[in-house]
Amino acid sequence: VVKLTQDKRPDITKPLEKPEQLGELKAWSYSALKVFEECPYRSYIQKVKKIQEPSSPAADRGTQIHQEAEDYVKGELGELPASLSKFKNDFEQLRDLFAEAKVELEGEWGFDLEWNPCGWMEKSTWARIKLDALVHEDEQSARVIDYKTGKKFGNEIGHSQQCLLYAIATFFRYPHIDFV
């Protein structure tokens, strides 16, 4: 028995046993895959037992900045938030394109085992892709955007893998697209 109760985690009220088989993960996302690769048991606790880790200040900051970015691009904020000031031109352009209906925000895309698009929470959902923004550049091309607020250096490979996955998903969701 592995004891996972903690004084700081009142939601965990009793020890959890680690079974021989950790259980089936029905669907995955890029971040869920990274958790599984790092520690399958952590993935089991999160996805099968449904016990979430407490949020960190860095994660809270990232969530806040993502929300500010979404609200600004949608036109719900008059002024560009200070947290986005380094990318002022990019966010102004994104906002203009959103006003022209050329940008999708916070897309929740589901795919089945054959990479056919399906609902985010359908029974057949095998993969989940959550895009921050997709810009429809023209009839044949799109641009995938995933905001990053954490550590830049040392994460380049992971970030490029995630963008590649999102590009592949874009091709399956929009078969008429030739370039991402």
What are these regions (language model features)?
Residues 109-180:
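Mg2+/Mn2+-dependent nuclease catalytic core
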Residues 1-139:
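Metal-dependent nuclease catalytic cores that hydrolyze phosphodiester bonds in DNA/RNA
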